[in-house]
């Protein structure tokens, strides 16, 4: 009873402090630059979307600061003479509000004043009807999603999910879970879930920390030509940049995990983001009396620096470590049935990549190098007795690796946008499976294989938009191939 009173008092005080904290205001600061020249845009108007009376103008260095903004999710509406008006993605305004960098595109035909009208929809010439942009508000407030983007998109037209309710296997337009592609700041991610099914893209828990996400583009058709291998859908994550003004840190305690994230700058130009999470599902599942005890750790990091006025370098890393052991002490008919066939599972996966971008007037060149790795291991003993190797029924170790180099160029020619690129990759797969099968006699299967494949891709595309934006067109071919296994 005493413990209950202390708990009620603790949560009451926490709620009171939370309500009091929400009553404060915070500044929103950032910088407005030209998208191609990377030079600051002076005297641009920056206002809160939906609250045009509250805003600021940029100074000669393109910097702005809006004071006394209420906490919550906001977008900025930015306009300047000679540039196309822009509404930014959604940002969370709090004590850890990020430094916001806005890129404006020139509009030489604009010679008179404009009125900024933010639209909740985004239409591109490349994917006019099959693109859905997921903002911060939808990530935070989607019911039942637990800030997991794979669960958010389940409610979209044409999207189904695995009949096993706890998994994030997406079935888009009648396809399969293996037909979805994931990209993060232009770098391919093979899977964004813990305890993944090898060869597919599902899993029960997302590796991606939503705190680092700026917005997500979800394509269900008309895929961009530079996204290889997409058959059903593409989820393209764009991450936030680190805070260029101050160091901020955040600790979280969730229903199944604890986490620590931070953002800031290193010296002058480089900015960083990082996130580390550790689950305590093993403790919860043991208290609930479940026969399996999953545990996971994941981490993300992003570093971005300006090498010069026209050159940027971004380094990205994403890693997940999964471990599911068996609770062999659990008794009962259901538990014994599950323990009879569930193996012990260990997985390690990571992706690391670097992207260099050069702005050369109307041309933007991007070179991306990335490597992803998956190590999947299953182990099972007869009656879960590992005292003797004679009881071994399954030992599996499967490793997948892929290294990708991609170079592309995008040219802006007034109403035309032209892009072209090339991609080279090398994939390596190894498998060693030792399995004992029980039929009318005992059979021992020892399977070993190794496979390496060199692949390539060529893509190009062009987009056109009329002066009044009433007519847009886009077309882009892509060719992929590969050499014989090595």
Question: Which residues does each PLM region occupy?
Answer:
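Transmembrane beta-barrel architecture of outer-membrane proteins
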Residues: 73, 148, 167, 203, ...
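Transmembrane beta-barrel outer-membrane domains
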Residues: 23, 109, 163, 230, ...
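Flexible, surface-exposed loop regions and adjacent strand-edge segments
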Residues: 133-135, 201, 290-295, 329-339, ...
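Predominantly transmembrane beta-strands of Gram-negative outer membrane beta-barrel pores used
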Residues: 181, 215-226, 232-240, 247-291, ...
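Face-selective signature of the C-terminal outer-membrane beta-barrel domain
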Residues: 304-322, 343-486
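Periplasmic N-terminal accessory/gating domains of Gram-negative outer-membrane beta-barrel systems
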Residues: 84, 89-92, 97-100, 117-223, ...
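Transmembrane beta-barrel domains of outer membrane proteins
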Residues: 77, 105, 152, 173, ...
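Periplasm-facing N-terminal accessory domains of Gram-negative outer-membrane beta-barrel systems
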Residues: 21-113, 117, 124
């Amino acid at each position: 009873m005493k413990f209950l009173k202390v708990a009620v008092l603790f949560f009451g005080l926490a709620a009171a402090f939370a309500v009091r904290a929400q009553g404060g205001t915070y500044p929103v600061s950032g910088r407005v630059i030209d998208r191609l020249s990377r030079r600051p845009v002076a005297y641009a108007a920056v206002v809160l979307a939906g609250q045009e009376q509250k805003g600021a103008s940029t100074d000669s260095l393109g910097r702005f600061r809006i004071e006394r903004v209420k906490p919550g999710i906001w977008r900025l509406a930015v306009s300047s003479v000679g540039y196309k008006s822009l509404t930014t993605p959604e940002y969370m305004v709090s004590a850890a509000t990020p430094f916001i960098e806005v890129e404006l595109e020139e509009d030489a035909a604009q010679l008179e004043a404009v009125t900024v009208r933010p639209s909740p929809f985004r239409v591109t010439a490349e994917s006019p009807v099959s693109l859905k942009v997921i903002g911060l508000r939808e990530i935070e407030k989607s019911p039942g999603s637990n800030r997991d983007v794979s669960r958010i998109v389940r409610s979209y037209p044409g999207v189904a999910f695995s009949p096993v309710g706890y998994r994030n296997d997406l079935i888009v337009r009648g396809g399969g879970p293996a037909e979805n592609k994931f990209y993060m700041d232009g770098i391919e991610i093979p899977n964004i879930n813990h305890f993944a099914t090898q060869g597919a893209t599902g899993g029960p828990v997302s590796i991606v920390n939503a705190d680092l996400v700026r917005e997500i583009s979800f394509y269900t058709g008309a895929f961009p030509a530079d996204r290889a291998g997409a058959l059903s859908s593409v989820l393209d994550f764009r991450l936030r940049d680190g805070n260029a003004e101050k160091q901020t840190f955040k600790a979280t305690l969730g229903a199944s995990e604890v986490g620590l994230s931070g953002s800031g700058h290193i010296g002058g130009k480089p900015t960083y983001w990082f996130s580390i999470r550790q689950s305590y599902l093993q403790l919860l599942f043991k208290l609930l009396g479940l026969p399996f005890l999953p545990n996971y750790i994941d981490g993300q990091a992003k570093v971005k620096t300006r090498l010069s006025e026209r050159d940027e370098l971004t380094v990205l890393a994403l890693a997940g470590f999964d471990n599911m052991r068996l609770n062999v002490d659990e008794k009962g008919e259901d538990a014994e049935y599950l323990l009879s066939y569930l193996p012990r599972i260990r997985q390690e996966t990571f992706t690391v990549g670097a992207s260099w971008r050069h702005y050369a007037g109307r041309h933007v060149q991007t070179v991306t190098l990335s490597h992803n790795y998956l190590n999947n291991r299953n182990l099972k003993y007869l009656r879960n007795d590992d005292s003797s190797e004679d009881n071994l029924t399954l030992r599996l170790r499967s490793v997948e690796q892929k290294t990708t180099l991609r170079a592309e160029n995008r040219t802006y020619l007034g109403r035309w946008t032209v892009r072209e690129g090339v991609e080279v990759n090398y994939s390596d797969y190894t498998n060693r499976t030792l399995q004992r099968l029980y039929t009318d006699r005992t059979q021992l299967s020892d399977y070993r294989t190794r496979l390496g494949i060199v692949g390539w891709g060529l893509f190009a595309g062009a987009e056109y938009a009329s002066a009044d934006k009433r007519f847009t067109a886009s077309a882009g071919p892509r060719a992929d191939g590969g050499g014989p296994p090595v």
